[in-house]
Amino acid sequence: NGEIYAMVNVPEFDLNDPYTLNTTSSKNMSDKKKQEALNGMWRNACVSDTYEPGSTFKVIVAASALEAGVVKLEDTFHCPGFKVVEDRRIRCHKTTGHGSETFVQGVQNSCNPVFMEVGARLGVDNMFHYLQQLGIMSKTGIDVPGEASTIMHRKENVGAVELATMSFGQSFQLTPVRLLSSISMILNGGTRITPHLGVELESSDGTAVKKLTYPAQENIISSQTSETMRMILESVVSEGSGKKAYVEGYQVGAKTGTSEKLPRHSNKYIASCMGFAPADHPVVAALVLIDEPQGIYYGGTIAAPVISELLDNALPYLGVERGETVTAEPG
């Protein structure tokens, strides 16, 4: 429903001592470098910084394609390890190819050629229609300052290559809170939500004075598409690239991502994973980003275990018992 339980940026800092760097030693830093480090530490990257989402964005594209009726679960695709789009040879992360696979397997494998084909089926008009419908093109309206806007191609400038790269989450940027908010609309049955930290106003003695309300809109996508996407994303954990997001006793859905930072070929990446649970009736969703990891940089390897740990702690705290089927509305 948009209520934010936690929002964390690392490194953190002590509000009582904001000028002390909570990083490596600053003794050898110039004043300029120290100020840059402080500014970075103070920024709320979840809201104020944009990034290329990579394969976590495939949740948006998959839901759009299902809603538009341009793809069915049993549709088959072929991945030779790349796809030629105009004069570009755009590769899959599995350079030897996934071979023949269904649409569901394409999501499980996070296969770029499958999503380039799905994006082509959607077309530019449909793609931008659903980006608008799912809120990608606008700010979330979160109740904290400094929210950044999505940086997206102008529709009239999108050709086949741009459409292909957009389809697997590259060549544009958005904020983490924007992505998770839009994915939440897909998971919650199709209701547009406003992410928020504030729940109610209280008097000095703790008495509730006013319950805060936020804009919401139903039927952004169909409940059938929502249910189908939850099923597909649960299979990403049980059968696909999100196995390390598994939490014993819970049905977890997830989508991993690995995006290369600009400039390309700099060997700098953002590893990410979005996860939610219980998969059949979600009560909580989370997004983890690891900026410029050293060594292994795949989201399924290093970000998915963080999602697993988060959900393993959050679900019991929220009163969801292991093995329990949730029947109440998501909270």
Where are these regions (language model features)?
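Ligand-recognition elements built from short beta-strands and adjacent flexible loops
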Residues: E309-G331
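Small/polar-residue-rich segments within soluble enzyme cores
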Residues: V288, S308-E309
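Short alpha-helix boundary/capping segments
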Residues: I221, G295-V306
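Beta-lactam-recognizing serine transpeptidase/beta-lactamase-like catalytic domain environment
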Residues: E3-S55, I60-I290, G299, V320, ...
